[in-house]
Every structure is written in structure tokens, then in C-alpha cells.
Amino acid sequence: MRIVFMGTPDFSVPCLQALIDDGHDVCAVFTQPDKPKGRHGVLTPPPVKELALKYDIPVYQPKTLKTDEAKELFKSLNADLAIVVAYGKILPGEFIHAPKYGCINMHASLLPKLRGAAPIQWSIITGEKRTGVTSMQMDEGLDTGDMLISKSVEIGENETAEELHDRLSSLGSEVMRETIAELQAGNLHPVKQDNEKSTYAPILTKELSKIDWNDTAQHIHDKIRGLYSWPGASGEIDGKVIKIHLSRLAGACSGKPGEIIESGKRLVVSCGDGNAVEILVLQAPGKRAMPVQDFLRGNPIEKGAFFE
């Protein structure tokens, strides 16, 4: 099958690798433009581009898909199918309808839940117990197309967004392979999404980082896990913004919201529902992240102090 692949970050790589391994004719890869990275702003290609070049697959990196030039280029590829995995751009209708079998997207949620840019992180932040990957026949809406195949996984009680990302990235290639096989066999049965059951997973911003210690311990723990490793959850103490990378639930307590009720071998903070979270890894401004005991040796926090 002649396939155009559209994807950008690490999450997309297993799907492209699977297409190559399965012997499909990947006639082109569309990915985001190279971006400056690091202290010196070195122009760095996306992970998908690096893999494509390794296999001599033509790579296209248009800044926009809205130009006639981009639309004509895509149409000229005469693809049977486009596979879209975390590409990072909204596809115009001319792209969606150009391939023989249209465009199929691998979305990292159990649609119609968590449509949008950050479904992995929001599945944890919102306390979901299960999530997964859904293949979807793309239309011109935002993750509103007919569902094809989905597979689900349980979210671990201490699992971070980064860990879940890696699991769903692998699962995505399984869903993609099954979707293509069923498409070729003529066995796909698209199911319309129930819009009344849809939820939204907007892009993450730094403004989400601040922890509200009046919230429940479970919600705070979920936020810390869901925002790991970017933008990261944070709390302010003694005028310093401290990033909190890892935590776990610590049971019932009698402190006030944000109060440090234990400090030394452990760092335990009271939350708004009479339960506490234990902070495991944290980071001072301009420093590296470190385990709590190492952190407290250089940045002592007294029992009875408060996170704001």
C-alpha cells in the first residue's frame, strides 16, 4: 500500500518504523520544520525526520499546509492512504480527501474522551483509570472523525505522563497495524463518536503548573504525575518556586492545606481533604531535580512551613 506518513515527535516513531518493517511503500513523510534546541539554539530535526532519512524516504516540512503549493504536492503523491500520528498541524480538507482511503489518525485516548492536543497528560490529570489509542478516519473537525479500532490500557496509580506516553506510543503501532490490515481486508466498521460524551484535552501551558493545596491529595498527586516532565507541577515556599516531579499518596493527616507535616527522611504535605502527599523528587530554581533527601540537605524545609 502506498502511504504518506505525517508525524513529528518521538511518539510517532514506532508507527513509522512499523510501516517500514511491514513493507509498505512509504512514499513520503510530512513533519514539522527543524527547530532550534538547547542553550546554543542548534537547529534540530524532528525524530520522525531522522528515521525517514535513515531509510531514504523523501521528507517534506512545510511551514503551512494552507498554500496551493502544499496541497498540490500532497495530491501529486497519489497515495492510497495517509497515516497521521501527532503531526502537530490541522489538515485542510484537500489533504483529508486526497488519498484513496483518506487519512487515518492514531489518537492517544479512548475517543470521544480527551479530544485535543494533550490527551496523555489530561488522562492522568483528570483521574482516568484507563486510556488507550483509537484509530480514526479523519474529517475536518478536531478529533471528531469516525472511530475504527481502539485498544485500552490501565493507568498505574503512580504512573507519570512520560511513562504512559511510552506505553501508548508502542500501543499506537499495534492499533495502526491492525487498522491497516482490516482496511485491506475490507473489514473496517467505522463508528460515529457520541459528541455528548466528548471531553477536551487542551495544550499544556506553564500556567497549569501551580498546585492548589486546598485540592484533594488524589487530585494533587494526579496533577504532579500528569504534568511530568513538562511543564511540571510546582509549589512556592519561602518565596521560591519549587518544581515537584514525583509524589505518592501518604494517607490521612491533621495538617492544614500546604503545611509540611513531616520533613527529614520524608517530605509530606497536607492537602485540602485531610489527606497528604509525599514528595519524592523536587527541584529548586536553577538546579537539577533530585531525590528529597538530597534536596533537603542543601535546601532545608522546616516541619510546619507552608507551600503557598
Region locations from a protein language model:
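N-terminal Rossmann-like dinucleotide-binding module
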Residues: 1-39
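Internal alpha/beta domain cores that form substrate/cofactor-binding pockets in large enzymes
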Residues: 2-4, 27-28, 58-77, 90-108
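A residue-level signal for conserved active-site and pocket-lining positions in enzyme catalytic cores
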Residues: 7, 29, 52, 82, ...
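Structural motif corresponding to alpha-helix initiation and N-cap regions
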Residues: 13, 42-45, 67-71, 89, ...
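Donor/substrate-binding cores of folate-linked one-carbon enzymes
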Residues: 22, 32, 81-200, 207
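N-terminal beta-loop-helix "entrance" segment that forms/cooperates
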Residues: 35-55
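Acyl-group handling in specialized metabolite and lipid biosynthesis
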Residues: 202-215
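An anion-binding loop in the catalytic cleft
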Residues: 214-308
